[in-house]
Amino acid sequence: MSTAEITANKAAFERFHEAANTGDAEVISKTIDELVAPDAVIRTPLPIGATGAEALKQVWAMLLRIYPDINLTVEDLIAEGDKVVGRTTVTGTHQGEFMGVAPTGKSVTYNEIFIFRFAHGRVVETWGVVDVYAQMRQIGVIPA
């Protein structure tokens, strides 16, 4: 993979996060359509039945309901070959039901790490680790 392709893949990762930070479901959905292959393989367990790009759209719709003011800060971004790895800090206010927990109004900060694999300029596979424990602790489900 060329240096230009690696640079473009990193830019796509950042663009995805910039779209997420708009808090606008339509902007996020359009960005997913542009950056993610419709049949992308999502290797992160998701609480929905959809697959591919549609799964990501549904996850983001859910996240915007839970944390309408969600904000992602990319702390580290590493690219090699066809993969981009990002470590992100996520903040938001718990304003929608989350895993059966009614809104608490509490501020939440958690970390996640995602790997995006690219082919022909689009995301074709993802892996992710999201710190759900931190979210549950901060909204009071798990004792601190």
Spans of model-derived segments:
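C-terminal and inter-domain tail/linker signature
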Residues: 1-144
